């Protein structure tokens, strides 16, 4: 049985190339190509695809919006986000909504087909570069969250805040209006 697919990308040549690749494998029926999120929703309703390959940064209704709608309505559709660049925030949002795959447009053909096969076998596929970027971002934010002050550091911070005069836009360093602060 062939897998039904919808391709969503505002770059027609790219979308047609993906269509040709999928058809050449003999395992897919491309039910349609959409150039916008709104058009994608119409194709989903009409064709009930098993897989959507979607550019994560399409127009007015974004790839994330499409993903949310599909997940909220519990549609049994696999979703592969494809992007020309790594956007950590979009990747994290997509992962939070259980995207099935994230891949870059400059990936090799074998990586692209591996991503699709992994997804169709109920595995998640995340391109290694995207995974590294997300992990680096999360490690940085985790370090910020874990920072705690000692009792003494807290006391010093409170003293500093208490003794700091309010900022006025007319008072700049060197204007002769600075005050000495005694600790």
List each language-model region with its residue ranges.
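Short, flexible helix-to-coil linker/hinge segments that flank and couple to helix-turn-helix
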Residues: 91-95, 100-147, 151, 155
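Active-site beta3 strand of CheY-like receiver
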Residues: 47-54, 58
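Conserved acidic segment of CheY-like receiver
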Residues: 2-14, 18-22, 52, 149
């Amino acid at each position: 049985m062939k897998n039904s697919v919808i391709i969503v990308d505002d770059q027609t040549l790219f979308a047609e190339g993906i269509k040709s690749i999928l058809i050449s494998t003999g395992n897919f029926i491309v039910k349609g190509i959409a150039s916008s999120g709104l058009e994608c929703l119409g194709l989903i309703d009409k064709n009930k695809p098993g897989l959507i390959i979607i550019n994560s940064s399409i127009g007015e209704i974004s790839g994330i919006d499409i993903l949310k709608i599909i997940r909220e309505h519990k549609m049994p559709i696999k979703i592969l986000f494809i992007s020309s660049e790594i956007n950590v925030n979009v990747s994290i949002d997509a992962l939070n909504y259980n995207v099935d795959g994230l891949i870059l447009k400059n990936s090799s053909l074998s990586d692209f087909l591996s991503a699709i096969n992994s997804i169709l076998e109920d595995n998640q596929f995340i391109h290694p570069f995207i995974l590294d970027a997300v992990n680096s971002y999360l490690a940085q934010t985790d370090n910020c969250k874990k920072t705690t002050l000692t009792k003494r550091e807290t006391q010093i911070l409170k003293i500093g805040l208490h003794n700091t005069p309010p900022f006025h836009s007319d008072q700049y360093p060197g204007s002769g209006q600075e005050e000495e602060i005694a600790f």
